[in-house]
Amino acid sequence: MCDPHLFSFEVTGHSCWHIVNLFEELTDEGEYYIDRENKKLYFIPNKDIAGSEIRLSVLDKVMVSVENAENIVFDGIPFENSRNSGIYIQGGESVIIKNCTFRNLGIMAIQIGMGAEPQPHGKNTCHGERAEGVPVPKPISREMGSWQEYLYEFAAWDNDGGHNHSIENCHIYNMGAGGVLLSGGNRKTLQHGNNRIFNCHIHDVNRLDRTYKPAIHIMGVGNKIAHCEIHDVTCMAINLHGNDHIIEYNRIHDVVTGSSDAGAIYMGRDMSEVGNVFRYNFIYHIHNPYKTGLGVCAIYLDDGCLYNSVYGNYFYDIVSDGQMFFTPIYWTQGGQTSIANNIYIDCLPSTNPNIGHNSFDKMHNDELIIRCVHTEDFDDIHGVDITSDLYREKYPYLYKTYTEDYAPGTCYWNNDVYINQYTHFKDKENLDFSFTDEQQKKRDEYLSPVRITDVVRGYEKERIPYEKIDFYSIGLLNKEKMYGKT
């Protein structure tokens, strides 16, 4: 038996736990027990395995490490059957991973950027507050460690993700603890990483670690996730930290299946993480698995999230019926995000924000927020300085919020459409929610340009026309040809 250790923040009525690798419980088909000391596998098959190959991986290191290298291509290679991750990238430029399959790995497929040394045994952090005895993060190479646990408090950390790396046309599934860590860029200097994940199919990535290990964790500045399909994830599809990221043309469904108080796409708790764009995505079939827990949603802009853009998206069948009412786009105690041009189909009402504080007040009186937005020491990775010339020029509205109590409260809403009548759409059975020609004509007539102010997207007292959304451009491209060698 292992030594006792901390396994949760607290135990509640809807908490889940299970025992792993206990020989005495080896009773049913499909179960197995690993005797690590003697390197033996005990397995009760659930079908005839005559002629089958059974593999027991002992590799506990990352399979391939690429550090400070340039112009390298991995094409059509399967990475499988390891207790660690597939590829680790640190620094460098233009490392391309394409047409590869990642499966049956113990941690994740690809890690771009350094991890953090594991926290002391039995210690934890929660919402940016470290338990006594937990040190500041120490970067480590070729390992994940406790990077996720530190990010709420140290979101200005540059973990050396390099530049112009690309993950393309890959199939990622059956991971132990998430899919991809996509880092790059520097939040102190706002230098973009320009790293991307493009046209990848990612699913079933929480075999071992079921919360806060999303299909994609994106951090840093100026990275992109586009044309991906993400599904069957027990927590978030995408967890975001940083600035100026673009999340576009993705199809996301059947995620947060083992979580509550969560979103298919999640960001928050740092008022300096602005300039991110969520556009032209199709998010659907998001349901609350635990009725006694809090809600779930499509896009979650959590505590203090400001000045990002959510436009041109389709939301279908987003249902949250937990103890707290969540809407498809849900923000709490923040605001001032541009929400426009979205279509909601068979969803609960999507405008029910939880506005619990004033942004100006929090920036000056909440210690955690102060460290995020006004850390003048360049070497202090607690946060950035939004009063610096660099941030003032890039995000003038953010500086005004800090100095003048500018536009506290709600988001900017315009041209959003809510429909529960499926007769308006071309082919609902195949989830094609493009409008019929007749309905499109009616909508063009009805949605005449309106006068609105939206500082995030640069509209000041201008008329904003409704922008048509090309449903057929969303999701994987050339799906039948993209998986590479299997």
Language-model segments: residues:
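Extracellular parallel beta-helix/beta-solenoid repeat domains
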Residues: 1-486
